[in-house]
Each structure stands twice: as C-alpha cells, then as structure tokens.
C-alpha cells in the first residue's frame, strides 16, 4: 500500500508542478491550439490555449513509477518489471506520435497535424512492437507479460490466438483505445477526469490480482498475471498524473493535453488490459471512450451510406453541446457515467472471483 501512495503522490506532484511551467513555456513560444471551424461556437474562444500538456502527464507517470522503485531500493524492493516497462514504453511511443501531430498543428496553425497514414503507421508500429515483446520475457514461474488467450477478467483458455493473430489483436486494441481517448479529449477535463477513474479501477483490480496471485497464493480464483503489483503502480501513477493535470485542465482549461496526452493515455489502457488479462472487461471500464469512438464510426458510416448524420456532430459530446447543454454539464454527466461504468466493472471483476471460488 505504501508503494501505491508513493506512486500517486510523486506523479501528482510532478504533473501539477510541471503543467504550469509548460503553460508559460508554450505561451511564450505561441504553441496554441487551433480550433475546428465547424465546431461548437462556444469553443472558438479556446483558440490559442496552450496544447501538448500531455508531456506533463507522461512525465508524471514515469516519475511516479520510477520514483516508487527508487524508494523501494531502500527496503530491498524489486526493480522494474518487463510488464511495467512494456506498458509505459507503449504509452510513451504513442505519446511521441501524438507530440509530432501536435507540433505540426502548431507549426502550420491549423487543426490538422500528421496525415492519417503517418499517424496510423506510428500507432501500428508501436502496437506491433508491443505485441511481439509482450509474449517474451518469461519469468521463473513460466509467465510472460501477456497471454495469447483472449481474456475477460482472466484468460479464456478456449480462445487462444496464434502469435501472428495476437499481434494483429494488439494492433486493433492499441489503435482503438488510443483513438478512443483522443476523440474523447474534446471538452475541458473530460478525458483527464475519466482516465483518472478508469485507472483508479485498475488500481483495485491489479492489486487484487497481486494479493491473489497463483505464484504466491495458489488456489481457487488465483490469477496468472506476471507482474500485477507493477501494473498497480502504473495505474496509480496515471491516476496521480491525470489529477495533477486536471487541476489546470478543468474548465476553463489553461492547457490542453493534445494528442501527446490522449494517445499516451489510450496506450495505458491498452497496455494494462493486455498485461492484466482484462481485455474484455476494459470495454466496460472505459465505456465512455468506447461510446465516443463508436459515435464517430456511426456518423461516418451513416453519412457515407445514407447522406445523413446520426448526431448533430461527432464525437457525440459535441452533439449534446449543440443540443443546448452547457460544456460543464456535459463534462460532469459524462464523468458520472464513467464512475458508474468503473463501479460496474469492479463489481463484475469481483463477482467473477466469488463465482470461481464458489462463494
């Protein structure tokens, strides 16, 4: 528990202190966000708000994770794990793609950064490397950071993917989650607040896996997860980093996370879901992100096939704005829905454990 508190605290402090420094730096150099011309009229006054605040989030997560391990050395703690480094490596690589996208938007003074091909290639490259490496690094118990079995709250042994299919599966998961969080990041604080809740749920889930790991506590309901405690630290550090950033990103936002932050945070969800064997459960926890990307897909499909739009504007948080909801109303209600989804996800996780042990 001490390690979790250290991870949250260090990440929060780094994020909340680094963000205003970035605001001053980006403002001085004119690194402001461009706004969609077809967006809600209320968003036009946000033009010029500093972007790329995701740098503070990624730095906070790394600081929380590494700081906890450095502090643990004084108490003979274990070093970083393969699972932890791979999840953070994935998030950082995606954050790098987002950083380039943000930088191009700023340099060209328009709301279009990397073209779709370049952005997709960057995401797929990160996903392929992650998918290949995450099945390596077998530990003494014979566990690798991920399993080729499809998973709900643990492996579904009847659905095992061949290595090539598993890599393809990772490509889909990584691309879907990174884009889903990216689409959600359209209102002040919406993505950061929602991510804090989802990763808080992952703190509970992965810590429970750690306390009931088959390696240390074999028996009914135990979990075959390679490095559950390290995943807990990453989730906790993400909670702290998002809260620290949210202090400055809450409406009216002083800075936006940009694609730097949203793609990286999507990578955190993708990485945690794969390494904790909860790929299907993650869809419940991140229901808001799933709904946002689904609204975009439906809008595109409907317009191309019928010439009509399903929503006034997609992602669908803008639909409610154009329907007359205040931005803060949309944000708070979507946060509430995220909290409910996370609560449901934790209940499903715990319920499966109770059913497994026959309680």
UniProtKB/Swiss-Prot annotation:
The UniProt catalytic activity note for this protein reads: UDP-N-acetyl-alpha-D-muramoyl-L-alanyl-gamma-D-glutamyl-meso-2,6-diaminopimeloyl-D-alanyl-D-alanine + di-trans,octa-cis-undecaprenyl phosphate = di-trans,octa-cis-undecaprenyl diphospho-N-acetyl-alpha-D-muramoyl-L-alanyl-D-glutamyl-meso-2,6-diaminopimeloyl-D-alanyl-D-alanine + UMP
Transmembrane annotation, as ranges: 3-23, 55-75, 80-100, 117-137, 156-176, 187-207, 231-251, 255-275, 280-300, 334-354
List cystine links: none
Q: Give the membrane topology, semicolon-separated if more than one.
A: Multi-pass membrane protein
Q: Which cofactor does it need?
A: Mg(2+)
Give the Gene Ontology MF terms in alphabetical order: metal ion binding; phospho-N-acetylmuramoyl-pentapeptide-transferase activity; UDP-N-acetylmuramoyl-L-alanyl-D-glutamyl-meso-2,6-diaminopimelyl-D-alanyl-D-alanine:undecaprenyl-phosphate transferase activity
**Per UniProt, what is one Pfam family of this protein?**
Glycos_transf_4
Summarize the protein's role: Catalyzes the initial step of the lipid cycle reactions in the biosynthesis of the cell wall peptidoglycan: transfers peptidoglycan precursor phospho-MurNAc-pentapeptide from UDP-MurNAc-pentapeptide onto the lipid carrier undecaprenyl phosphate, yielding undecaprenyl-pyrophosphoryl-MurNAc-pentapeptide, known as lipid I.
Q: What is this protein called?
A: Phospho-N-acetylmuramoyl-pentapeptide-transferase
Q: Which organism is it from?
A: Mycobacterium leprae (strain TN)
Q: What lineage, starting at the top, does this entry show?
A: Bacteria, Bacillati, Actinomycetota, Actinomycetes, Mycobacteriales
